[in-house]
Amino acid sequence: MTTLNLRKDAAPAPAFVSAAARFGVIEKPDLAFTPAVARETEHLYEKVKDFIPAFEWAAYAPYVHAINRLKKERNAVILAHNYQTPDIFHCVADIVGDSLQLARDATKVDAEIIIQCGVHFMAETSKLLNPEKTVLIPDARAGCSLSESITGADVRLLKERYPGVPVVTYVNTSADVKAETDICCTSSNVLAVVESLESDTVLCIPDEYLAMNVARETNKKILTWKGHCEVHERFTAAELLAYKEANPGIEIVGHPECHPDVIAVCDFSGSTSGMINYVKDKRPQRVLLVTECSMASNIQAEVKGVDFVKPCNLCPHMKRITLPKIFDSLLTMTEEVLVDPAIADRARLAVERMVNLKQ
């Protein structure tokens, strides 16, 4: 029970001070493509030259150069999801990975400021795990169809309908939903999370296909919710079979946010990091990644000799994050991510249970 202090002399809550006021605004530097900028970014261009023509690099390089300088000046770190474009992933990010990796690494950063290059729920997760740090997202409109498919009120109704059944919630959700959750999961650890619970029945929400895929790997009864990723739900088994017929010997690597019929056609399925590790370890001659198409470009820069067939399904939300917006974040300190204190502690607990789960 919470006891409210109603004394007239109670100290008022401290006034909110914006990140811009706390850290100050930096004047916009020159973004000319000078010989010095070309020279200092040359090693980074080597990583992305297969995706960015030399004449276009003249527009990218000044932002890359300025961002990497501003990070040091601001004591900031950039966390980037595997779906970010190669210029962000390879040229300005300090930490890259899937949702689980980013959540874990967010707890280890020493920097005062976190710039989250991903969608909004990822930035919220970083804030939950780092309540004392300043977390910025370059574009607060970077949402997620899965996150928008369910609310905290929906979860409360599910708990009323299935009393005593533990709730496993995908991290692709808002803090409001996480606050109603027993434990979070990602696509890389969902089976381990489900198996860690003593109950024979588990609510696995909101991604219906992820839940259906994990149901095939466990003896527990899995209850689902009809949320879907707008990128992965577009893939079909017929489409992948057509690729196989047209490309004999091709290996298909899928993401468990796809329909189970799609996963059944794949040679391997796993989280984005699992997919990356599979390609790096197996080095297939030709491979098709059944996921957001920027990831194939990001791996291709690191894995030579592998032919990537790219069915290009783009995430419009991830693509809201751009170099100019990252640059503006570091200059103006806007789009700060805050979590309502009324739900933050409960949401944090669900994420921490996942992060601390023994694998």
UniProtKB/Swiss-Prot annotation:
InterPro entries assigned: NadA, NadA_sf, Quinolinate_synth_type2
Binding site for iminosuccinate: H81, S99, Y170, V171, N172, S187, H255, P256, E257, T272
GO molecular function: 4 iron, 4 sulfur cluster binding; metal ion binding; quinolinate synthetase A activity
GO cellular component: cytosol
Keywords annotated in UniProt: 4Fe-4S, Cytoplasm, Iron, Iron-sulfur, Metal-binding, Pyridine nucleotide biosynthesis, Transferase
Cofactor: [4Fe-4S] cluster
Gene3D superfamilies: NadA-like
Pathway stated in the Swiss-Prot or TrEMBL entry: Cofactor biosynthesis; NAD(+) biosynthesis; quinolinate from iminoaspartate: step 1/1
Catalytic activity: iminosuccinate + dihydroxyacetone phosphate = quinolinate + phosphate + 2 H2O + H(+)
NCBIfam families named among the record's database cross-references: nadA, PRK09375.1-2, PRK09375.1-4
Protein name per UniProt: Quinolinate synthase
Organism: Sinorhizobium medicae (strain WSM419) (Ensifer medicae)
